[in-house]
Swiss-Prot record:
Any one of the GO CC terms: cytoplasm
Key words, A-Z: Ribonucleoprotein, Ribosomal protein
Species this chain originates from: Maricaulis maris (strain MCS10) (Caulobacter maris)
Keyword Phosphoprotein: no
Basic and acidic residues bias spans: 97-123
Superkingdom, taxonomy of origin: Bacteria
Keyword Transferase: no
Pfam families, A to Z: Ribosomal_S16
A GO BP entry: translation
Chain segments carrying region Disordered: 84-152
Segments of skewed composition (Low complexity): 124-144
Listed name of the protein: Small ribosomal subunit protein bS16
Amino acid sequence: MSLKIRLARGGAKKRPYYRIVVADSRSPRDGRFIEKIGSYNPMLPKDGQRVELDMEKVKAWIAKGAKPTDRVGRFIHQIEADAWKWEASNNPQKAEPGQKAKELAAEKAEKEADRKAAEEEAKAAAAAPAAEEAPAEEAPAAEAAAEEEKSE
């Protein structure tokens, strides 16, 4: 029999209240449990009354092989760090964007590339007439210099 220390929801709609219970992992979330070892009221401000745990019972159940869920393990670690070593779970897929977000990012990147290409073309077009005019002005100066050499 696999034991879990987990939350069992109670309270009214939009007003949650949780019992921290030891239960068989196969039993329903709010169903039958073996023992109630604490409570969690998320409606209270963050203070000592928000999470109440009987740490002696918690340690006894952990010694018997019960494993806390992530949330309850975090509560246990916050109250008494020696009782349970809580580590943040690593889920790299959670941070990965969804299909629509990937498509939107690809469209945005494509539009950005088109916009940059258009800017480059505009700069090149603006520089080309200036480049054509500049050699035309230099050419008469070069001709004038050549004429001066001939006249000498």
